[in-house]
Amino acid sequence: MNSITDVGGIRVGHYQRLDPDASLGAGWACGVTVVLPPPGTVGAVDCRGGAPGTRETDLLDPANSVRFVDALLLAGGSAYGLAAADGVMRWLEEHRRGVAMDSGVVPIVPGAVIFDLPVGGWNCRPTADFGYSACAAAGVDVAVGTVGVGVGARAGALKGGVGTASATLQSGVTVGVLAVVNAAGNVVDPATGLPWMADLVGEFALRAPPAEQIAALAQLSSPLGAFNTPFNTTIGVIACDAALSPAACRRIAIAAHDGLARTIRPAHTPLDGDTVFALATGAVAVPPEAGVPAALSPETQLVTAVGAAAADCLARAVLAGVLNAQPVAGIPTYRDMFPGAFGS
């Protein structure tokens, strides 16, 4: 499927409101995406952007007490969008997911947001009902492009969106990634008109677009003003089925950021809140390789392999999110600007 849900037990749900006539400053154009892992999934996070909007990320520090993650929320609406986590918690409580207490459960729902408030009406932003509805819609089929948290996303001057990708390692471990691309930087090489690292997404059969289409990109500025919007953010979720510690997940999240640097230029700017979560379901136990020095963690070799695959998959997911995007509020898509890049 080439999806994050290729990792057994992972489910993804979207919910959005999108008015057909949404514009910059009016109408609904926002949404949320929820990743539901199986019980017992451990997690970690690494934030490299200068303007993050997050929830419960301190809890994911490997030094802290709670190990398991019940859901991850990716939301539009900037900090207001964090309200959608209340709906995720309500859904999880109804399904008895969370840290067991004497009188009930406390769901663990870390999350991160993108800044998309100028796309659509400023007051049209996710509520708790968005989070609840995304959980209720979760399944193994993952829609991409202009959906969920990606509805109001943009990538430089172009429309951004949600993408996903996966890979299977020789060890049998499956790595899957979900990304929402809402970057301040550009995803297209202005010299060629092709996305950076376009060779990673052979399924699109991209070819060099004609010179006039490349020239048109140079004349295009973001409808919101290039680098004049307050904040942006690309969020990634890495999932794998390996049995790993929270500290190992943190190292994988760190490595996965390379996927953003390969496909977004610049990435990790003061205008972005670039954040990557990493989840490990624990379904596949991989014995440590022989010969690992006793001074090193027995997870070292596996973490290296999973981290490398995570970076590759995150790069592919970024490209998939942009290439599958549909126009919203007059923000052009890659397909709008470069029809000549696609085979007939």
UniProtKB/Swiss-Prot annotation:
InterPro entries: ArgJ-like_dom_sf, Peptidase_S58_DmpA. The lineage of its organism: Bacteria, Bacillati, Actinomycetota, Actinomycetes, Mycobacteriales. It holds the Pfam family Peptidase_S58. It comes from Mycobacterium tuberculosis (strain CDC 1551 / Oshkosh). It comes from the Bacteria. One of its GO terms (molecular function) is aminopeptidase activity. It is found in: Cell membrane. This is Uncharacterized aminopeptidase MT1375. Aminopeptidase. PANTHER family: BLR5678 PROTEIN (PTHR36512:SF3), D-AMINOPEPTIDASE (PTHR36512). Keywords: Aminopeptidase, Cell membrane, Hydrolase, Membrane, Protease, Transmembrane, Transmembrane helix. It is a multi-pass membrane protein. The chain crosses the membrane at residues 25-45, 68-88, 104-124, 133-153, 161-181, 224-244, 276-296, 302-322. Its EC number is 3.4.11.-. Belongs to the peptidase S58 family. GO terms for cellular component: plasma membrane. One of its GO terms (biological process) is proteolysis.
